[in-house]
Amino acid sequence: MTYVISDLHGYPIEKLKTLLKKAGFCEDDFLYILGDVIDRNGDGGVGILQWLLSQSNVQLVLGNHEAMLLACAFLFDEITDDSIADFDSEKIEILSNYQLNGGDVTLKSLAKLNKESPETVCDILDYLRDCPLYEAVTTGGKDYFLCHSGIDKFEKGKKISDYPADAFIWAWPEIGDEYFDDILTVFGHTPTMNYGEQYRNKIIKTRTWIDIDMGAADGKTEPVLLRLDDMIEFRN
């Protein structure tokens, strides 16, 4: 079975494990997390990141928040005269932007972990650098394209390799947008309630795409785990 979930934003790792247990998730199954496990709440998602390092049947697809964290990876470099000299206004702006987007809680958790186990922080950053921008999967007799945000400025017939990286992590689809005719695109990034109050806590399914972001970034709303094989939803 193939499962997807997105935009956990600091969701407690123990609650995620409970949710997976509720779905009957086992070693023969596969879970795709469609970006944004970090920032905003709790431990900033660092617990999930540590867990991911040892999961062979779970894959994080890069989200815009992971991309922002990677842009701030210089914070975990060894402090030298050169690194101090390189800390310019551009890096300050990158850091400020990340903090404005809820990155403080993740940076604090990583800083604490860096004192205890700097090699683990290095492993986390390396893991994030290797995360794919998208995945193409077939399950339950259907083809799916999985990414964080949908596809910005989508053009039918355009090669996926011709899109810039930001197209898969910073898109804000309109409800009437369409993607592939024969492949369902699954993403998060835009909380479904942003499309109207009638979609609050509900997955949106259109002819060509599915949005599974329930808005857990608020720290109160529960995320949804979707099993693609039969479209059954699981929640805590």
Question: Each predicted region: which residue ranges?
Answer:
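Short amphipathic alpha-helical segments
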Residues: 17-18, 45-46, 73-74, 158-159, ...
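Active-site neighborhood of divalent metal-dependent phosphoester bond hydrolases
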Residues: 45-48, 53-135
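Active-site glycine-centered loops adjacent to acidic/histidine catalytic or metal-binding residues
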Residues: 7, 35-36, 63-64, 189, ...
